[in-house]
Amino acid sequence: MTTEKTVVFVSGATGFIALHVVDDLLKTGYKVIGSGRSQEKNDGLLKKFKSNPNLSMEIVEDIAAPNAFDKVFQKHGKEIKVVLHIASPVHFNTTDFEKDLLIPAVNGTKSILEAIKNYAADTVEKVVITSSVAALASPGDMKDTSFVVNEESWNKDTWESCQANAVSAYCGSKKFAEKTAWDFLEENQSSIKFTLSTINPGFVFGPQLFADSLRNGINSSSAIIANLVSYKLGDNFYNYSGPFIDVRDVSKAHLLAFEKPECAGQRLFLCEDMFCSQEALDILNEEFPQLKGKIATGEPGSGSTFLTKNCCKCDNRKTKNLLGFQFNKFRDCIVDTASQLLEVQSKS
């Protein structure tokens, strides 16, 4: 696939991960059509990218609405070669998990694939869907020290059992949305020509592409680091844990997922290593003199023991071999994330 002016559609283009992806696409020479939920959001994004002539935006107010992406593909279907479906509902402030998490995630995936089939079946060659480690393992599995997460594993929760709480329902939504995509591919092989890959990242940390995005709220993973910076000395904190990956590596993987033929048909499990909040606190206290003595310390040095006793194992050697690049280390990622956060706070 030639880079020069290949048209890539990016759903949810105004999001944390998607902004990095859009930036990498433009720098690599692709033409990008993105979607956002409102004209205001779209105009804001275009302004941030200085009205780049290779970037345009379309409105998709609700990805879960019937035929949500039809207008986009009716208008641009004959030029779009690659689709990166990054948009997904992520919120935990609900008690109707089926209505607010499960159904929107599944319908969003279904609607974009149906739109490709109906209006761009002869044009779209590659589809990459942003899934999650949550599709690979249930919350219970993530805390099982004998469990190994890899590219072949699946979250074992059912549609019913995942509705025990908001976190389980979100994890379930990622599983069922991804399964919808693979099932669609199998059921429609005779009427489509695109290959499918999924990106399955763990907790995604790293700096915002545009620092001022921090003033408009941040993604749930980045909020973990923001909260650690705001905790006072002696405060208790929740010791989050799981696989982590740098947002800049997630972005790079989205491009390689459609550029490298060997990534077609693959689930790419993005994990540099396991992390816990205690390890992040240790880094913050070690690397930022202005925070030392002011923020929580927890039990310095206890992170690795905590992970050994409370976390599953990750094996993504297959993904690393397919992608062929080194992921950013946790320390570098946390330092970059916190540096940006502190700089923005100092100016507000």
UniProtKB/Swiss-Prot annotation:
Modified residues (Phosphoserine): 339
Binding annotation for NADP(+): 41, 170
Domain of life of the source: Eukaryota
Gene Ontology MF terms in the entry: aldehyde dehydrogenase (NAD+) activity; carbonyl reductase (NADPH) activity; oxidoreductase activity, acting on CH-OH group of donors; oxidoreductase activity, acting on the CH-OH group of donors, NAD or NADP as acceptor
KW Phosphoprotein (keyword) present: yes
GO terms under cellular component: cytoplasm
Keywords assigned: Oxidoreductase, Phosphoprotein
Enzyme class: oxidoreductase
GO biological process: ketone metabolic process; response to furfural
Pfam name, any one: Epimerase
Gene3D superfamilies in the cross-refs: NAD(P)-binding Rossmann-like Domain
EC numbers on record: 1.1.1.-
CDD domains: AR_SDR_e
Protein family (similarity comment): Belongs to the NAD(P)-dependent epimerase/dehydratase family. Dihydroflavonol-4-reductase subfamily.
Note: Present with 2340 molecules/cell in log phase SD medium.
Protein name, per record: Putative uncharacterized oxidoreductase YGL039W
